[in-house]
Amino acid sequence: MVLSPADKSNVKAAWGKVGGHAGDYGAEALERMFLSFPTTKTYFPHFDLSHGSAQVKGHGKKVADALTNAVAHVDDMPNALSALSDLHAHKLRVDPVNFKLLSHCLLVTLAAHHPADFTPAVHASLDKFLASVSTVLTSKYR
């Protein structure tokens, strides 16, 4: 999915407002995903999935760091996320549908924390951005 200049601007501005809360938001989105889509828990059998778990917080930070990297390299996400794509496709073998589920939970989390900033245009831009990230992460499944 091609991001327009306006989309890129919206994504960078929205992610900039996340600031130091990125890891917390990542963990919150994971918790939402585990509660809303229980089948996603199967990829984390070794995790304590309870609220506030250090493992969920740690993985939430990894998710947030990957998204921060994608925002910083929005014009070259395939190269920026190549190692992560390899990991999810070849080692972890995560079903691609799970990226869509996590993307949805991230959008809900961002909207809950920044309702005034979560305009329809920003929502659409973030949705396109997360779809692009998902496409990159699943590109090596083929």
Curated annotation (Swiss-Prot):
The modification N6-acetyllysine is found at K17. Keywords: Acetylation, Heme, Iron, Metal-binding, Oxygen transport, Phosphoprotein, Transport. GO terms for biological process: hydrogen peroxide catabolic process. The modification Phosphotyrosine is found at Y25. InterPro entries: Globin (IPR000971), Globin-like_sf (IPR009050), Globin/Proto (IPR012292), Hemoglobin_a-typ (IPR002338), Hemoglobin_oxygen_transport (IPR050056), Hemoglobin_pi (IPR002339). Red blood cells. GO terms for cellular component: blood microparticle; haptoglobin-hemoglobin complex; hemoglobin complex. PANTHER family: HEMOGLOBIN FAMILY MEMBER, HEMOGLOBIN SUBUNIT ALPHA. Involved in oxygen transport from the lung to the various peripheral tissues. This is Hemoglobin subunit alpha. It comes from Ateles geoffroyi.
